[in-house]
Amino acid sequence: MQSYQQPLRVGVGGPVGSGKTALLECLCKAMRDHYQIAVVTNDIYTKEDQRILTEAGALEPERIVGVETGGCPHTAIREDASMNLAAVEALARKFGNLEVIFVESGGDNLSATFSPELADLTIYVIDVAEGEKIPRKGGPGITKSDFLVINKTDLAPYVGASLEVMERDTQRMRPERPWTFSNLKKGDGLQAVIDFIVERGMLGVRG
């Protein structure tokens, strides 16, 4: 039987449209020259996120696998993660030397969490367009994720959101846990996410 190493599994969750796929594209493009990476995407009835990442050239197509979860998306990352676990194992066996596998959840609500059997680290993405109230609403995605990304800061003036209020509420809701504001269109906040993954995942700094 071919041996393979166990990669770091990083779960990326958040509501529909928050920027999960955009974050993954940025992470893959920034890290692929230094680390062996693959991605598992989750969609309810399609493999749309897999297609988006493939067409964006985030990674080689064979390193991106789409899972059609059906039903409620959080079930596939928490209560019954078997499809995702199988996809992760298949990628790890196929490449043998993978160091990081990102698992993107289907769009879900603030209560979504990853099973510890599926993700070693969790990143949760919300966006400013949902309003400044989102951080203080709490929920496991806000309070328990290992890293929180508040995306689309450029939209704050258009939706009447105060970044100062969001910062205050975020620090109150997760006082000991890291987070960052981001505007992925400009790359703002991306390095903070990469540094977190490298440090907490004990990957070693390269490049």
Curated annotation (Swiss-Prot):
Superkingdom, natural source: Bacteria
GO aspect biological process, one term: urea catabolic process
GO CC annotations on file: cytoplasm
Keyword Chaperone on entry: yes
Gene: ureG
Source organism: Pseudomonas putida (strain W619)
Subcellular compartments: Cytoplasm
Name of protein: Urease accessory protein UreG
Entry-linked SUPFAM superfamilies: P-loop containing nucleoside triphosphate hydrolases
Main location: cytoplasm
Binding, GTP: G14, P15, V16, G17, S18, G19, K20, T21
Source species taxonomy: Bacteria, Pseudomonadati, Pseudomonadota, Gammaproteobacteria, Pseudomonadales
Gene Ontology molecular function: GTP binding; GTPase activity; nickel cation binding
Assembly with partners or alone: Homodimer. UreD, UreF and UreG form a complex that acts as a GTP-hydrolysis-dependent molecular chaperone, activating the urease apoprotein by helping to assemble the nickel containing metallocenter of UreC. The UreE protein probably delivers the nickel.
